[in-house]
A protein has these predicted regions:
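Conserved ABC transporter NBD signature motif
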Residues: 69-80, 370-381, 392
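Short catalytic/signature loops enriched in Gly
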Residues: 2-8, 147-153, 244-295, 304-322, ...
């Protein structure tokens, strides 16, 4: 039972946070009140720009130099954090309050062993001495369920999966047993089973230690599944606060209802995700001629388990070391077809081989064996570098996972969209190129005035539209979508999914949709393929696989998806 009689552990009152910019002062958080009780798990939900992360940075006193707390109070365990000295705050961070950041790889030092990074925190806060710090670090790795902790102690971040890196960040955050843990989007980019394992691990450890947790997320399903109370933020203000059991069943604010509507859930259609009053996508369909557009036959991709590949050795002018170990099979003899106008979902956990498969189908990666047949031509036999210059490249395009990372920061939106046209198209600059770019922008719903902006001047949804416009610029027959909505807010995701569905119908394209989110796959795909350890374990129509799964692994994926009460 929550401690509601005593004062809250964290008490935020009338907090206002401002940032100084070239265009004047921007208020990121305005007069908010939030409290966290001892032992409570509080969720703060909202879209990008709502102020939820800025609030957490203000609590930790790690605001950007341009930011400042303009008004209000932040009290932690009876201490006024606004007036605390920098030395006292540095001492409290890690020992009394700690934070899990959104990107685990960015939060870790890439050139320092993970075990040493845990030791740094223990030694900084005098939780260990040199004589026993290694033993304590290994014990903490064991607590966060890192397999073979003695071995992983010596690993660098790049040698670990995303899920393992997140566990290391959790280990560092909980090493000194703080009273308060702030988790800022701790599962973004993780597959559903890893997400479930990470969240259950965090809550298990915090409950064991009687800690309070603040979960910052845009995933309402996550908040519903793991939080006692939920705070909803919009444009820097708190618009609703209520117990999680209440807020999702009877949301009082229109913005909360909008977020609920946009969240994929069992039984929902693409149209259901849009705001009321928005026009429905085109209902046109494409008839297949019976021949597969893309046929994958017994496709295999192998990597050496140690040393360097022959290709790398040739590139660096070295001799590849001999190894007696069997190579690792990332993709192990899979076969499937994509018909014209069809959307095929390729799902599975991280490391299952789905992205490797999509990269080979896109001809960005050469297969070890097997065939990739595009409309009767075996393009798998053509080296990836050579294929990039062939006319057939125009027929297959890709929308990448992260709309920010996939755009050149030095290119304007127009330059990014027209890049494939300049490389492989028949329009060469001038007014014709601008007209074609504006046509594509209109097609994906990107306002013309944004074409001359750079990626950092665009929102996540706008960058996603640029990526889609670039992918369809050459009128491809097949578009490979690699987790295209994983990093987007739910309302933006809903719009992008409907846009993709409309474009497929209008332009007659086929999709290979790579994802770990089965709710999203069900909305967009006709056929679903489930991969595990490089092999296909189940496939069939979307309704068949997702409503009546035959394989235990598929059932585990479906069960791991958190979603708000229907």
């Amino acid at each position: 039972m929550l401690d509601t009689v005593h004062k809250p552990l964290l008490d935020i009152r009338d907090l206002t946070v401002e940032f100084a910019t070239r265009r004047g002062t921007v208020t990121a958080v305005r007069n908010i009140d939030i409290s966290v009780n001892k032992g409570e798990t509080l969720g703060i939900v909202g879209e990008s720009g709502s102020g939820k992360s800025v609030t957490s940075f203000a609590v930790m006193r790690i605001l950007d130099r341009a930011g400042r707390i303009a008004d209000g109070s932040v009290t932690f365990s009876g201490i006024d954090l606004r007036t605390a000295s920098d030395h006292d705050m540095a001492d409290m961070r890690g020992r009394e309050m700690s934070m899990i950041f959104q990107n685990p790889r960015a939060a870790l030092n890439p050139i320092r062993k993970v075990g040493h990074q845990i030791e740094d925190v223990l030694l900084r806060h005098v939780q260990a001495v040199r004589a026993n710090v290694r033993e304590k670090a290994i014990d903490i790795l064991r607590q966060v369920r890192i397999a073979r902790p003695e071995e992983r102690y010596h690993a660098y971040p790049f040698e670990l999966s995303g899920g393992m890196c997140q566990r290391i960040v959790i280990a560092i955050a909980l090493a000194c047993k703080p009273q308060l843990l702030i988790a800022d989007e701790p599962t973004t980019g993780l597959d559903v089973t890893t997400q479930k394992a990470v969240m259950e691990l965090v809550l298990e450890l915090t409950h064991q230690r009687g800690m309070s947790t603040v979960l910052i997320t845009h995933d309402l399903g996550l908040a519903a599944a793991y939080c006692d109370r939920v705070v909803v933020m919009q444009k820097g203000e708190v618009v609703e606060t209520a117990p999680s059991a209440t807020i999702f069943k009877t949301p009082a604010h229109s913005y909360t209802r909008k977020l609920m509507r946009a969240t994929p859930r069992p039984g929902a259609t693409l149209r259901d995700l849009l705001e009321e009053g928005r026009p429905a996508p085109a209902a046109a369909s494409v008839q297949s001629d019976g021949r597969p557009l893309l046929k994958i036959d017994n496709l295999v991709k192998e990597y050496p388990r140690q040393g360097i590949t022959k290709t790398m050795a040739q590139f660096f002018g070295r001799k590849a070391p001999a190894t007696t170990e069997q190579p690792f099979r990332a993709v192990d003899g899979i076969s499937f077809e994509i018909m014209r106008g069809q959307s095929v979902g390729l799902v599975g956990e991280s490391g299952c081989g789905k992205s490797t498969t999509s990269m080979m189908a896109m001809r960005l990666l050469d297969p070890t064996s097997g065939s990739i047949i595009l409309d009767g031509e075996d393009i798998g036999a053509i080296p990836a570098r050579a294929f990039a210059k062939l006319p057939a490249r125009k027929r297959i395009q890709m929308v990448f996972q992260d709309p920010t990372d996939s755009l050149n920061p030095r290119f304007t939106a127009m330059r990014a969209i027209t890049d494939p046209i300049l490389r492989l198209g028949d329009v060469r600059g001038g007014d014709a190129l601008r007209a074609r770019c504006e046509e594509l922008a209109q097609l994906v719903g990107l306002p013309r005035h944004l074409l001359d902006r750079f990626p950092h001047q665009l929102s996540g949804g706008q960058k996603a539209r640029v990526g889609i416009a670039r992918a369809i610029a050459l009128h491809p027959e097949l578009v490979i979508l690699d987790e295209p909505t994983a990093a987007l807010d739910v309302s933006v995701q809903a719009i992008v999914l409907n846009l993709l569905d409309e474009l497929k119908a209008r332009l007659g394209m086929s999709y290979l949709f790579v994802s770990h989110d089965l709710h999203v796959v069900r909305l967009l795909c006709d056929y679903v393929i489930v991969m595990k350890n490089g092999r296909i374990v189940e496939e069939g129509s979307a309704e068949q696989v997702l409503e009546a799964p035959q394989d235990e692994y598929t059932r585990e994926l479906i069960a791991a998806i958190p979603h708000p009460p229907v």
